């Protein structure tokens, strides 16, 4: 369908933008990140400030632990455009955490919690990881317990990870 849109409406930038964005998402879901990133790059050539693509691209790079500087720059644009978007705050905070900046990441997660972050198992898990890294174990466990209650397979291996973190706290 996306290729058809690109054939039919090559000069309609809003349609081609959505087509490349959708193709990027589909390729990512199929596990072909190389093609996903190429599709996202094409979308960003049409609109370099398209926050949906910027966030997904940045998040997927962060999950792979790749190109964190690029991911940071893309994610920064998203929180500047939508400072109360819990998903974008999560991506930005997670990238900071992966860069070894847990203390800098914490306020972004606190803010995300005010704007829907408590509805997301992923965001609560990420926040708990940040708190754990900062040795705020009790609060980390509060968020992990909330995440465990809501987890419906969204975060694979969460229960085992929380058990391991509890063991690490006892040492």
Q: Where are the language model's segments positioned?
A:
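Residue-level recognition of tetratricopeptide repeat
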Residues: 25, 59-60, 94, 129
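TPR alpha-solenoid repeat register
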Residues: 15, 19, 53, 88, ...
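Short coil turns that delineate tetratricopeptide repeat
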Residues: 10, 14, 48, 83, ...
């Amino acid at each position: 369908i996306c290729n058809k849109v690109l054939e039919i409406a090559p000069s309609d930038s809003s349609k081609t933008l959505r087509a490349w964005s959708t193709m990027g998402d589909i390729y990512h879901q199929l596990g072909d990140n190389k093609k996903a990133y190429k599709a996202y790059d094409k979308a960003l050539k049409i609109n370099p400030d398209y926050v949906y693509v910027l966030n997904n691209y940045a998040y997927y790079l962060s999950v792979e632990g790749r190109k964190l500087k690029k991911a940071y720059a893309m994610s920064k644009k998203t929180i500047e455009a939508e400072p109360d978007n819990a998903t974008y705050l999560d991506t930005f905070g997670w990238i900071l955490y992966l860069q070894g900046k847990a203390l800098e990441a914490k306020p972004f997660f606190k803010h995300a919690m005010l704007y829907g972050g408590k509805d997301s198992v992923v965001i609560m898990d990420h926040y708990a990881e940040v708190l754990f890294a900062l040795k705020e174990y009790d609060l980390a466990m509060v968020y992990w317990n909330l995440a465990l209650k809501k987890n419906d397979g969204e975060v694979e291996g969460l229960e085992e990870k929380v058990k391991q973190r509890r063991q690490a706290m006892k040492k």
